[in-house]
């Protein structure tokens, strides 16, 4: 980790984003409350940043919005991809550039399963953000998978909130330095709380990023013990195995 980098609290990060008048987006969270967006509401100044929040908890209602999953799973990579695509598309459809010529749109999403009551299944989740680096740029995406190690659902919810804030902040303020995006994911968190075992960055801002090498940074930085690639070079989570 970069010991010289100043680590901001979740409130400080959320407030800086809220005070940036050009950032504007949607938060869609499933499975662990609205733990990410609450940081932005509590920080203050969120009215110009948050276009909408949504938590489609009921499976039938969620399917009506994002479509059904082939294997019936709701905490999976394809779900996060659909959530990002749908929510970002709605912003472009409903908010005209004539009225908001300088806005950088974004859609944040997570789909999470926290540890169950009997502690027989560990919590995990998919997190993603689709975002612009300028009002005229094509969007980029960052998607990651995390496994939670805490033995309490409430603690895992709190970790979910912190990780989401770190991802959003890193996307906007560190996108030119992908390794720093990774490092910042653990701001105010540690390996005992969660393990990030997959990350994928795509879009014009990451045109020079080799995602396989980026995933190896997860091991190098101590975020996970191993990473997996598909035959075509795509990053996979251990949960795919």
Regions found by a protein language model. Give the residues of each.
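Long, mid-chain structured domain cores
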Residues: 94-237
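Conserved small/polar residues in nucleotide/adenosyl-binding loops
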Residues: 239-241
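Short alpha-helical segments enriched in small residues
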Residues: 2-146
């Amino acid at each position: 980790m970069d010991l010289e980098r100043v680590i901001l609290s979740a409130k400080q990060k959320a407030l800086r984003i809220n005070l940036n008048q050009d950032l504007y987006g949607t938060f869609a969270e499933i499975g662990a409350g609205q733990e990410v967006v609450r940081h932005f509401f509590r920080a203050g100044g969120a009215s110009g940043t948050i276009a909408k929040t949504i938590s489609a908890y009921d499976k039938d209602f969620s399917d009506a919005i994002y479509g059904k999953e082939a294997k019936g799973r709701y905490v999976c990579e394809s779900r996060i991809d659909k959530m990002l695509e749908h929510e970002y598309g709605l912003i472009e459809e409903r908010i005209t550039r004539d009225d908001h010529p300088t806005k950088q749109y974004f859609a944040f999403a997570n789909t999470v399963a926290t540890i169950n009551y009997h502690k027989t299944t560990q919590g995990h989740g998919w997190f993603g953000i689709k975002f612009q680096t300028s009002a005229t740029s094509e969007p980029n995406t960052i998607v990651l998978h995390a496994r939670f190690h805490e033995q309490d659902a409430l603690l895992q919810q709190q970790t979910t909130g912190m990780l989401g804030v770190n991802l959003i902040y890193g996307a906007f303020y560190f996108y030119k330095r992908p390794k720093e995006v990774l490092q910042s994911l653990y701001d105010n968190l540690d390996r005992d709380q969660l393990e990030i075992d997959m990350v994928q960055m795509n879009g014009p801002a990451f045109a020079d990023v080799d995602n396989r090498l980026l995933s190896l940074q997860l091991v190098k930085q101590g975020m996970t013990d191993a990473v997996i690639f598909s035959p075509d070079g795509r990053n996979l989570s251990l949960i795919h195995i």
